[in-house]
Amino acid sequence: MDIVPVVALCCCLVLLPSWAYGLGSMASIAVSYGEDGPVFCGLNSDGSHLVTCFGADASVVYGAPSRIPFVGVTAGDGFACGLLLDTNQPYCWGSNSYVKIGVPQPMVEGAMYSELSAGDNHLCALRTSVKGFHSVNGDTSVIDCWGYNMTATHTVTGAVSAISAGSVFNCGLFARNRTVFCWGDESVSGVIGLAPRNVRFQSIGAGGYHVCGVLENAQVFCWGRSLEMQQMSTPSSTDDGDVNIVPMDAMVSVVGGRFHACGIRSLDHQVACWGFTLQNSTLAPKGLRVYAIVAGDYFTCGVPAETSLKPMCWGHSGPLALPMAVSPGICVSDSCSHGYYEYANHGEVGSGSKTCKPANSRLCLPCSVGCPDDSYESSPCNATADRVCQFDCSKCASDECVSFCLSQKRTKNRKFMAFQLRIFVAEIAFAVILVFSVTAIACLYVRYKLRHCQCSKNELRLAKNTTYSFRKDNMKIQPDVEDLKIRRAQEFSYEELEQATGGFSEDSQVGKGSFSCVFKGILRDGTVVAVKRAIKASDVKKSSKEFHTELDLLSRLNHAHLLNLLGYCEDGSERLLVYEFMAHGSLYQHLHGKDPNLKKRLNWARRVTIAVQAARGIEYLHGYACPPVIHRDIKSSNILIDEDHNARVADFGLSILGPADSGTPLSELPAGTLGYLDPEYYRLHYLTTKSDVYSFGVVLLEILSGRKAIDMQFEEGNIVEWAVPLIKAGDISALLDPVLSPPSDLEALKKIAAVACKCVRMRAKDRPSMDKVTTALERALALLMGSPCIEQPILPTEVVLGSSRMHKKVSQRSSNHSCSENDLVDGDDQRIEYRAPSWITFPSVTSSQRRKSSASEADMDGRTTTDGRNVGSSIGDGLRSLEEEISPASPQENLYLQHNF
């Protein structure tokens, strides 16, 4: 696109009594164009004055400032500019080599501007020294320009009310006599020499090589060059396609494309276009009423006069549907002048101020003029609404009038039928009430007579026995009903927890975070607990939200590898949660604590076991909780270890409920811990369950290497940047924790490293889901253990979601392998934990059931199954031959585009 189009249906600035929005004029909407494709930009409709862009040119779409408010916007070839709300200076973005990103230079210090206009490769701004006045003094105006062959300061005699830009030229409109003047390159268009003298305009709109203006009588006048390459184009509205041959309709405003122009009719605010358009171009929608329009080189966009305020485009190569709501005009601080009314959003009078900032500003739109021949004016235009025309059914001359009158007649018939129906329903209701009343009176009379009748002793005895039998049966049912009640978290008093922790003394403190402290306590019944006490913060609302989030989730979730919540306390500003006490602290303390013996105690088998158990807990959150739960703070310090060295996932303060479809993204502000935070979530605010997968991948790298997620004592402080190249190079030995001796066979650890590498991929759709991660880790654990006869904490098929640990398999007890009876006795001494059922979860699913959906994996991998009689002797080799299968799972591409553009 070679032309800069912007038009709005409202008063641009405080001192603009009429419009001058041309191709490159400033308004609430603008379009850029060029080799990289078209882009539509507009001010948001929520009154924030923030700009949003949508289109093909990434430099304009992603370069748009997301937190800077603007008065209005304009655009050119590969760039867009806006007038800053705070400083009244222009700010540009995009990829144009002549108009740089930021505030254009050179810039006069302290200069303020009231109007912008952008051409193909230049930008001009109308300077003002006093806010609200265009001229430096009463007789002169200053216009600064930047860009290709246009960088200069122009001093014009006379006050200028508006400016508009074409491809290589600029035009302005004098405020006093409403005449037009132009400057720039004359060689291509001839616009400067052909500019009319002593012709008064309400507004002007420059196109590529022509200018159109609305005269004081609302007629349109155009001058300049028309397209002569007729073999490449087809006329849109006139016989010869000449842009200078204009329609006779009265117009509110006009805009210009490269070789075409469009205007808004005063009568009905519908769009009329004329001039040349390319082949296969879409026409303007018939009957479309708009608030504002803006033209590109070969297309035009408009803001429909609907409550949605979602723009639509027509022509060639432009975006046809735009999924964003924009402001229909620029806000002004003065009251609306004669011929304008105040815009009220959603049809509510006075609510138009919500689309403007500050609150005392408003958005003014021009009134429609007159009514069609078959209509009459039922109410005139006033300060709060446009004029209203009603069809005269006795003078119908259009299809719309005929259709309206027929619908009105049908409406009257329906109203009459509805009235008759109400009468009929009332009669039926009266009859029903009468019958019911008679029946009730009869029943009461019969009951009264029965109570006062004389019954025999046998009948009384029979009735008594029947009543006793019923009560007895009812007593039997009652205990079963009580058994169905679900246990909830217990509520403790603050005094009870204060006594249990010794007054929350430092001696009982076992951990401290940014928002809470954890104390060890002993309840009156001797139960050892961990009490999490929230640190009193200034943001009480946020602290209370995190407290109730964690309380709500933990009281409903039920899994062996999630931290068990025993109770809570909320007393004034005090908020406390009571958990099971984890005797061995956190995984972080073992891997990175000051005591080196803790690190040595975690041999490779225990480390991988902890990883498998934590993965199962996260898999439960993603796959079996309904709706799914996204933890958002998976890290080694939030994986706790109990007295049996089983892992528990803890700290649900940042957790949120995900959508029922786990692949659907959420738009959330980033929350979590640096080093573990998903890069895609951090940059794009694109949150899915794959964000937890990334954090868990970092934890796997910690388990393998013994290094912190971020450790600045190393040259490469980020563990992902350090570990991933080693894994891809196959140098696993350099990755492993030097504190532990590497196992004789590194194959299992190589598989775990490969899983971690896939988990920390930059794009979420390339990461595996947690069920696939868990399956791969279970296989790696089995391969690491080498044989089912070796004492192992948990085998891949021995854990059921919802129970802590299972007894060893019966087949293992009767195995022909050399397993001693003492080993079996020790293995049977396991702690079984029972939890209340969870009403937010699906039924528990075993790891073997999880893999039933991928039946015959051995056949797909080219492996053969051994005979059942040889299982005891060959299961170790069978487990070693298993290969992990992790395929990426990602949301659909259209969802990604929808949530980011």
Curated annotation (Swiss-Prot):
Domain of life: Eukaryota
UniProt xrefs under SUPFAM superfamilies: Protein kinase-like (PK-like), RCC1/BLIP-II
Signal peptide bounds: 1-22
Skewed-composition ranges (Polar residues): 889-901
Record's keyword annotation contains Cell division: no
Example GO biological process: root cap development
Known partners and oligomeric status: Homodimer.
Described function: Receptor protein kinase. Could play a role in a differentiation signal. Controls formative cell division in meristems. Regulates epidermal cell differentiation in many organs. During floral organogenesis, required to maintain the interlocking of the palea and lemma, and fertility. Triggers culm elongation.
Name of this protein: Serine/threonine-protein kinase-like protein CR4
Organism listed in the record: Oryza sativa subsp. japonica (Rice)
Gene name linked to the record: CR4
